[in-house]
Design a protein with these regions (language model features):
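Mixed-charge, low-complexity intrinsically disordered regions
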Residues: 1-65, 69-139
Length: 139
């Protein structure tokens, strides 16, 4: 079975490196995205609770397998501090979480009512690169 990709930030960026590192350390167990980034607006389907995804690293290499454990679609104003903290990026206020995400989402207008996909996940397994290919670690 081929797993869909789980991408954080953009490939080749410091942000991607830092976010993936936070997942691998266990610091990041949540992520937020705009509902408009998913179907039917784009070809990207919403994550599904219980499904597993291939976490990709800095250069789009496979680095882990994650499983979605919760999915909520909330107005931006309803994202809470615990979720912001669980994103593992050092947010200590919802205002700092929102400001950082508004910068990341760039030119798109974010209002209090903008639908945000709040996804919680767990790291199921790390993958290790070997000669340019990922493999499961020995158990």
């Amino acid at each position: 079975m081929r797993l869909q990709r789980f991408e954080l930030g953009y490939a080749g960026t410091v942000l991607r490196r830092d976010l993936v590192g936070a997942v691998l350390r266990g610091d990041k167990t949540a992520t937020a995205s705009l509902l408009s980034d998913y179907q039917p607006t784009t070809a990207e389907p919403l994550p599904v609770v219980g499904h597993r995804y291939l976490l990709v690293g800095y250069a789009d290499e496979p680095v882990g397998i994650v499983e979605t454990t919760q999915l909520r679609i909330l107005p931006a104003q309803d994202v809470d501090l615990q979720f912001a903290r669980d994103e593992g990026e050092g947010f200590e206020t919802v205002a700092s979480w929102r400001a950082a995400h508004e910068r990341f989402w760039g030119h798109r207008l974010i209002t209090d009512n903008t639908p945000i996909v709040c996804e919680r996940f767990r790291l199921v397994r790390r993958l290790y690169a070997k000669r340019g290919r990922a493999h499961l670690p020995s158990q």
